[in-house]
Amino acid sequence: MKEFTGKFNVQSAEIGIVVADFNETVTKQLVQGATEMLAKFDLENVDVYHVPGAFEIPFMTKQLLAKKEYDGILTLGAVIKGETDHYDLICQNVASGVMNLNLKSNIPITFGILTTDNIEQAMQRAGLKAGNEGAITAQSLLEMISLNRQIN
């Protein structure tokens, strides 16, 4: 039996990050956590693409996939529940959009888009009290790049 495990050390990987600027107080922290994690593994080929909001993340991710320059793409954002159905529509469509791209792609795409009930939860998940989801999602991306390289 063979077992394959993703490693964090993926030499010379080129990473694309797509981040929504809406809820920028939170998303700046997510980007910082992600880029600091990638820097720990000496990954310097990191490009960050800012989009207005979470809804635009799947489109920009699709554009980056078409460029065929990256070994993996990390998506970051923060959707915070309000008083209307807008939250549910955005969350469902963005998650579906990113998942559909991931399934059709030959490179991994990780989902670091927070969906929270309030700003306090979002700040906690961006590293205020616990781990930074940007960093955690970056680690997941490195593992998936490693696994992808092992099977291809």
From Swiss-Prot:
Query: What molecular functions are annotated in GO for this chain?
Result: 6,7-dimethyl-8-ribityllumazine synthase activity
Cellular component terms per the entry's GO annotation: cytosol; riboflavin synthase complex
The record, for Pfam families, names: DMRL_synthase (PF00885)
Give the catalytic activity: (2S)-2-hydroxy-3-oxobutyl phosphate + 5-amino-6-(D-ribitylamino)uracil = 6,7-dimethyl-8-(1-D-ribityl)lumazine + phosphate + 2 H2O + H(+)
Going by the UniProt record, its keywords in alphabetical order are: Riboflavin biosynthesis, Transferase
Matches recorded under InterPro entries: LS (IPR034964), LS/RS (IPR002180), LS/RS_sf (IPR036467)
- Residues of the active site are H86
Which pathway features in its UniProt record? Cofactor biosynthesis; riboflavin biosynthesis; riboflavin from 2-hydroxy-3-oxobutyl phosphate and 5-amino-6-(D-ribitylamino)uracil: step 1/2
Gene3D superfamilies assigned to the protein according to its UniProt record, in alphabetical order: Lumazine/riboflavin synthase
Q: What is its EC number?
A: 2.5.1.78
Q: Which residues participate in 5-amino-6-(D-ribitylamino)uracil binding?
A: F22, A54, F55, E56, A78, V79, I80, F111
Q: Where does (2S)-2-hydroxy-3-oxobutyl phosphate bind?
A: E83, T84, R125
A single GO BP: riboflavin biosynthetic process
Q: Which protein family is it in?
A: Belongs to the DMRL synthase family.
Under NCBIfam families, the record lists: lumazine-synth
Summarize the protein's role. Answer: Catalyzes the formation of 6,7-dimethyl-8-ribityllumazine by condensation of 5-amino-6-(D-ribitylamino)uracil with 3,4-dihydroxy-2-butanone 4-phosphate. This is the penultimate step in the biosynthesis of riboflavin.
Protein name as annotated: 6,7-dimethyl-8-ribityllumazine synthase
Query: Upper lineage ranks?
Result: Bacteria, Bacillati, Bacillota, Bacilli, Lactobacillales
Gene name of the encoded protein: ribH
